């Protein structure tokens, strides 16, 4: 069978888009299925080589401004042209996976599949990571006018695909989409790197508090200077490792913030390089406490790939009380909630977590032991279902094929 991964946002090494495609390809390879990728037109050479990625899309899923009513139509047309050209060369696959699907990708793919009416309709596996506006929670009245375009796009995709299996990362986001799309929506974290066992913290070693990932504005890095100063003045041993990539993010002008953090002294390590998968996992495993001060006005319903990784590794977290992704940690005893969204509240939450680090860590380790990674099962079912369907169709066609009799030409 043929599989294809589509993610217009994958363009460089590191980050959860790269990790998602890499994990999907590895899992599918284990099932004997090759899965090339269509990614950003600006994908660098390592992405092209390591992910079998064809640079395709000039618009990222994060590239919309939502400024005019015609922007959606323009985005669909441009994405559709680029998708049609790429699939003209590669052919229509049996299985299409979109690890980060929005309404533009959905509508463009639906129209492309309608053009390929003579071919068997593919099975589609997709994740809906955010609402119709990627920078606003679906509850925001300013995003409500986008519900119509999303409803139309996913309805058209449902009518063009053989079947659709869809997931959100939180129950709250899944509830929103169940009222918007004509297919079922489950709850499962997006494809991430396989969990790696973490060594227990050595007795007497100072605790390490970390923040890691792309430094987009909604990730809350602007709260760090005040928070770290608050903690450093009240805790004599703690060490901070603050990793944030500003290049390619929407916060490239925030470099002075990281310069300020680097001036806070020897107990603060600041890193900004792109991390390969192994480096990311190694850095994550060093953390005794993970900071996820994500803006609630963006992440109220959304999931977090870093949180999912922390869950599987067994790391306590600090996050805003409103963020749905962190609710399992709050309820499971391995998360501390920020009472307000500002730097001082982040610092207070960190101090609370440091005072309770041993029981928080024990609960995090217990939660990690119970965590289930369902990606392999889902992909296996998708491959087996599609292969069985293709075999059944081939058998049916053979029944109607003219037979060659002895003596016939």
Predicted regions and their residues:
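Nucleotide-activated donor-dependent transferases that construct or modify glycoconjugates
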Residues: 1-14, 100-102, 210-212
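A short, active-site helix/loop in glycosyltransferases that binds the activated sugar's phosphate group
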Residues: 136, 141-185
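Nucleotide-activated donor-binding/catalytic signature segment of Leloir-type glycosyltransferases, i.e.
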Residues: 158, 254-281, 286-289
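Conserved donor-binding/catalytic core segment of Leloir-type glycosyltransferases
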Residues: 199-219, 225-232, 240-241
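Nucleotide-sugar-dependent
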Residues: 292-308, 320-322, 326-327
């Amino acid at each position: 069978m043929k599989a294809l991964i589509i993610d217009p946002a994958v363009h460089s090494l590191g980050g959860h888009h790269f990790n998602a495609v890499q994990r999907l390809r590895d899992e599918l390879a284990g099932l004997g299925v090759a899965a090339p990728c269509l990614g950003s037109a600006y994908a660098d050479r390592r992405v092209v080589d390591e992910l079998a990625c064809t640079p395709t899309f000039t618009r990222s899923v994060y590239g919309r401004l939502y400024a005019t009513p015609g922007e959606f139509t323009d985005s669909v047309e441009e994405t559709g042209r680029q998708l049609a050209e790429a699939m003209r060369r590669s052919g229509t696959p049996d299985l299409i996976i979109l690890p980060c699907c929005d309404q533009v990708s959905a509508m463009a793919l639906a129209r492309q599949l309608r053009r390929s009416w003579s071919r068997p309709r593919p099975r589609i596996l997709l994740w809906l990571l955010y609402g119709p506006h990627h920078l606003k929670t679906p509850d925001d009245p300013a995003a409500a006018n986008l519900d119509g375009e999303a409803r139309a796009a996913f309805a058209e995709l449902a009518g063009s695909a053989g079947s659709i299996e869809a997931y959100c990362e939180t129950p709250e986001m899944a509830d929103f989409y169940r009222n918007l799309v004509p297919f079922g929506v489950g709850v499962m974290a997006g494809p991430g790197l396989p969990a790696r066992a973490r060594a227990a913290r050595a007795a007497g070693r100072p605790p390490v508090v970390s923040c890691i990932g792309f430094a987009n504005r909604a990730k809350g890095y602007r709260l760090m200077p005040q928070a770290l100063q608050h903690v450093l003045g009240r805790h004599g041993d703690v060490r901070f490792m603050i990793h944030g990539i500003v290049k390619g993010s929407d916060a490239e002008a925030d470099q002075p913030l990281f310069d300020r953090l680097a001036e806070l002294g020897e107990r603060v390590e600041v890193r900004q390089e792109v991390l390969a998968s192994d480096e990311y996992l190694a850095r994550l495993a060093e953390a005794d406490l993970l900071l996820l001060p994500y803006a609630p006005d963006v992440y109220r319903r959304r999931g977090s790939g870093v949180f999912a990784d922390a869950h599987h590794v067994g790391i306590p977290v600090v996050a805003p009380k409103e963020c749905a992704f962190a609710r399992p940690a709050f309820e499971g005893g391995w998360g501390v909630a920020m009472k307000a969204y500002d730097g001082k509240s982040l610092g207070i939450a960190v101090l609370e977590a440091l005072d309770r680090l041993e029981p928080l860590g024990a609960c995090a380790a217990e939660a990690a032991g119970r965590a289930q990674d369902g990606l392999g099962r889902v992909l296996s079912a998708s491959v087996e279902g599609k292969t069985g369907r293709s075999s059944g169709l081939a058998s049916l066609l053979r029944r109607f094929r003219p037979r060659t009799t002895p003596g016939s030409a």
